[in-house]
Each structure stands twice: as structure tokens, then as C-alpha cells.
């Protein structure tokens, strides 16, 4: 039995995230990160016969589960691909506006715990790290050709690793002797070049995170999908995003703030804030984190943050609509 099959996947902030969508029985909803379908199944339980749920995932294993669900529930539509193709995928399915969209960002427990996927330094496996194993460059292939500067920048920017330059230099030196094609080889190089260890954290944690984020274009896709969702939400529709680390949460937070709050007016301004045009989003509640009971049951939930925004009647700036074209 593989790690993906043996690990019991626990959906993070299950009720809180679906509650945030305020699901209507006849609504159209999107689960942008199907995983093993925890959020999707709860959404379906609240939809009536006329409702629809479109699910996205890159991972072929997740898509297999989603397609099995779709065979038994005609309300479900499945998209094998990243959520950055949000608008194009909806167009292909003949769907216009939607009532809500949910994104549970980052890597899933089945992906981490399946040693063969190459996401974790806990297993010695081929260094792959692709969420979609059917396309794109693997981590090993990229590490084999990336320049020392590119390695440094990825590890520094996506892993926030203080020793990124030393790690990059060591990778280049080692690959000149033999390929760095397994998780163990990469983890050993990192361990030899991280001078101080963070309490309770393996020295390879930040580097593995950085390479995974880069290989899967995780941050670019988050930045790309948010304006697309804003364009497709009906008035009153909800966007709910669960982030697990500061890089992706910062993107979500800044996006929602930009389109829900006017910049402060100077004291000498002749116009009042109340006279400014309505913005396209409004923040719903405060950022929500898992409670102690959920963290005790699922320690991986500890860093999760849920942010929710609602579409208003405010117009969407033209430049935001243009930004979505790259991913269509």
C-alpha cells in the first residue's frame, strides 16, 4: 500500500471554509484544489439537484478520485489542470458566473506521504516534486541545468532560506561529479550546508519547499487565479482561500486588500471616502485559523489561514481584467 493510500487525509478547516461560501442550493461552485474531495463532498451535501460543482486538480491520483465522484454525481464537473486556467476551463464547460470558489493551497498529505512522489526528504525516492506527473520538468531535471544564481534565488525567495547561496554552490559542485536525482542526495547536500538548525525542523525543509513551489509555479498560479475569480463571481459570491505559508497568504491578503479598501486620502483631498466608487470586493470577517482541537487531531493544520472575500456590485478595474489573459 502506498503512502498516499495508507495516510488518512484530514481536510483542514472543513466546515469553516464551506460555511464561508454560504452555499446556495441552486448555486454554481468551484473547488480549485480537489485533493481527496473533503471540501467538495461537503459542498455537494449542501447543493440541491440544480446546483453544480466544478473541481480542479493537477494530480492524476486526485483526478481519478474526482472522476469516480463525477460518475456517481452528475452535478460534478472535473478539470485536470491547474486552477490558473480558471476562466478558460469554465468557458469550456459553458459556465459563466459562479456563486463561490474555494482554494486549499499547497501540497496535500497524500502527496507528502507517498514517498514515490519525491516531495519529502523523509523518503529516499526519485526527485520529482511535480503535482502533475504527466507534464513539465521534474525537480531533478531542473536542478541538473539551473545556474547557481537561479538555484540561490529560488531557495532564498521561495524557501526564505538564509543559507541559500551556500546550498546553491554545493549543488553545482556535487552535480559536476554525479546527478542529484533522489530526495536523499538533495537532503544530504542541504544538511551539510545549513550551519544552524531551527528547533523541530529538518534542515532540508526550506529548500524542499522552495524547489516544490518553483517546479509547480505555485505562487504564480495563486496570483493569476485571484483576478479571474473576481471577474467570474456573481454579486454576493464568495472567495475562500486557505493558505499554509506566509508567501501564498501574503499574495491573497494583498489582493483582497487592494480590491476592498481604498488607499487613504490625503487631508487636503476635496473628495470624501464615502464618495469614492464602490470597490469589487469586501472582506468577510477576520482571517481564521484552526482551533486547538483541530491542530491536536491534525498537526499539519497548524499554519493554515482562511481568508474570505465577497463580490460586491463595484466595477472591476480594466487592468485587472487584462491580467487574466496570460492564462487563458
Swiss-Prot record:
NCBIfam families: 16S rRNA (cytosine(1402)-N(4))-methyltransferase RsmH. One of its GO terms (cellular component) is cytoplasm. It is found in: Cytoplasm. Specifically methylates the N4 position of cytidine in position 1402 (C1402) of 16S rRNA. The lineage of its organism: Bacteria, Pseudomonadati, Pseudomonadota, Betaproteobacteria, Neisseriales. It holds the Pfam family Methyltransf_5. It comes from Neisseria meningitidis serogroup C / serotype 2a (strain ATCC 700532 / DSM 15464 / FAM18). The keyword Methyltransferase applies. This is Ribosomal RNA small subunit methyltransferase H. GO terms for molecular function: rRNA (cytosine-N4-)-methyltransferase activity. S-adenosyl-L-methionine binds at residues 37-39, 57, 83, 104, 111. Belongs to the methyltransferase superfamily. RsmH family. Keywords: Cytoplasm, Methyltransferase, rRNA processing, S-adenosyl-L-methionine, Transferase. One of its GO terms (biological process) is rRNA base methylation. It comes from the Bacteria. HAMAP family: 16SrRNA_methyltr_H.
Amino acid at each position: 500500500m502506498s503512502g498516499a493510500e495508507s495516510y488518512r487525509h484530514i481536510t483542514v478547516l472543513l466546515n469553516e471554509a464551506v460555511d464561508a461560501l454560504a452555499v446556495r442550493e441552486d448555486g454554481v461552485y468551484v473547488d480549485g484544489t480537489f485533493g481527496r474531495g473533503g471540501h467538495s463532498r461537503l459542498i455537494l451535501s449542501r447543493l440541491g439537484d440544480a446546483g453544480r460543482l466544478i473541481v480542479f486538480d493537477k494530480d492524476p491520483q486526485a483526478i481519478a478520485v474526482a472522476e469516480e465522484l463525477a460518475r456517481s454525481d452528475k452535478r460534478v464537473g472535473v478539470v485536470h489542470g491547474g486552477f490558473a486556467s480558471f476562466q478558460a476551463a469554465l468557458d469550456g464547460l459553458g459556465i459563466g458566473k459562479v456563486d463561490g470558489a474555494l482554494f486549499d493551497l499547497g501540497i496535500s498529505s497524500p502527496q507528502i506521504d507517498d514517498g514515490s512522489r519525491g516531495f519529502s526528504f523523509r523518503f529516499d525516492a526519485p526527485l520529482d516534486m511535480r503535482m502533475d506527473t504527466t507534464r513539465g520538468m521534474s525537480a531533478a531535471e531542473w536542478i541538473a541545468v539551473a545556474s547557481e544564481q537561479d538555484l540561490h534565488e529560488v531557495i532564498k525567495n521561495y524557501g526564505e532560506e538564509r543559507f541559500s547561496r551556500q546550498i546553491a554552490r554545493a549543488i553545482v559542485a556535487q552535480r559536476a561529479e554525479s546527478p542529484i536525482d533522489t530526495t536523499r542526495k538533495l537532503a544530504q547536500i542541504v544538511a551539510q550546508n545549513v550551519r544552524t538548525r531551527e528547533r523541530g525542523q529538518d534542515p532540508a525543509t526550506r529548500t524542499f519547499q522552495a524547489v516544490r513551489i518553483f517546479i509547480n509555479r505555485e505562487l504564480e498560479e495563486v496570483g493569476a487565479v485571484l483576478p479571474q475569480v473576481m471577474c467570474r463571481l456573481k454579486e454576493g459570491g464568495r472567495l475562500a482561500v486557505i493558505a499554509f505559508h506566509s508567501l501564498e497568504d501574503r499574495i491573497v491578503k494583498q489582493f483582497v486588500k487592494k480590491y476592498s479598501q481604498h488607499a487613504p486620502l490625503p487631508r487636503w483631498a476635496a473628495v470624501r471616502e464615502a464618495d469614492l466608487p464602490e470597490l469589487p470586493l469586501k472582506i468577510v470577517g477576520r482571517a481564521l485559523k484552526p482551533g486547538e482541537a483541530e491542530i491536536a487531531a491534525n498537526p499539519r493544520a497548524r499554519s493554515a489561514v482562511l481568508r474570505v472575500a465577497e463580490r460586491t456590485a463595484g466595477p472591476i478595474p480594466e487592468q485587472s481584467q487584462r491580467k487574466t489573459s496570460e492564462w487563458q
